[in-house]
Structure formats: C-alpha cells, structure tokens
Amino acid sequence: MKKKIYEGKILGLSVYDLVIEGRKVKREMIEHRGAAAILAFDENNKLILVKQHRYPHGYVIEIPAGTLEKKEEPKKCAFRELEEETGYSAKKMTPLITYYPSIGYNTEAIHCFVASGLKKITDLKLDEDEILSVIKMDFKKVISMIKNGKIQDSKTICAVLTYAFKKRLN
C-alpha cells in the first residue's frame, strides 16, 4: 500500500507498507522521474562542464544534466539538456552507465551518455531557476579534481571514472 505524502515539481514523497519475505515493513521513498547526464568533448577534446549554483552547496562543477520530463526517454533528455545547458547539439548519444545515487530511499536513476558529433548551435536556454556557466577542461584535469575532492558531484564522478575505466580497458 502506498500513501502519497507530498508531490512537488521535481520529486514526491510516499510511504509504502510492504511485505518482504513474509515481514511487514514500512519504507519512506523519495520519488523522482530520473535524469540524464552527458559527457561531451569539444573540437579540442576538452570536456564540456557547467559551473552551476546548487543550493545549499553553492557553485559546483559538473557535467551537463537534467531531470526527465514526464514520459521522456533518457536519450531524448540528454540531447535536450546538452543543448539547453551548453548550446551544443550532438549527432549521437551513446549510453555509458545508469546508476542509482541513493538506492535505499530514492527512485532516481541517472542515465549517463557520451555525446559525439558536437556542433555549437545556440546560446544557453536555461530554465528560469538555473544559474550556470559553461567551462571546458582537459579530461586529466577533471580526473585530478575528482582525486583532490574539488569535484564532488556524484553523476560527474560516476560518468568520468566509468569513461576513464572503459577507455583504459579498451
């Protein structure tokens, strides 16, 4: 049985009464449609990142990303968010990894993609509450910033390290 406690623009909160292996349990669950995140390299092989204000943490450096619209496919969201946040279009989005940032109490899945065939086409198309700027960095510098704790965003860490790991194995 599910009891909806709250429904907002981005997330909801429900309490579930479940039976797991014959035992009655309660689970509080933050419900989120999920997100798409994008690793995109420009024509000079620099990783395109955004410096974005994320309350309550202040400004963070992260890969472009955004929440799925209702019934939107993750790949479509990735194309849309890349263009909105960076002004770049991509010819192709290749799935990299899907992961659950808070699996015990949150339904959110983050779908990470690698964009290719990039072309600068427009200025940023930010949502009214987004405060960000585009920055470009060498991939090795991004790895160094992760190692030094300067990049702390989980989707960025997961996507960058997965990409580096897969490249190293190939």
Which residues does each PLM region occupy?
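Short, well-ordered beta-strand micro-motif
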Residues: 15-17, 40, 114-116, 136-138, ...
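Nudix hydrolase/Nudix homology domain
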Residues: 2, 22, 70, 129-170
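The catalytic Nudix box helix
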Residues: 62-95, 113, 127-130, 138
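Acidic, metal-coordinating catalytic segment for phosphate/diphosphate chemistry
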Residues: 2-37, 42-43
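Conserved Nudix-box catalytic region and its N-terminal flanking loop in Nudix hydrolases
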Residues: 36-80
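Acidic pyrophosphate-coordinating catalytic loop
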Residues: 4-6, 99-111, 168
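Active-site-adjacent beta-strand/loop module that shapes the phosphate/pyrophosphate-binding cleft
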Residues: 12-14, 18-22, 102-121
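Strongly charged, low-complexity linkers/loops
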Residues: 107-145
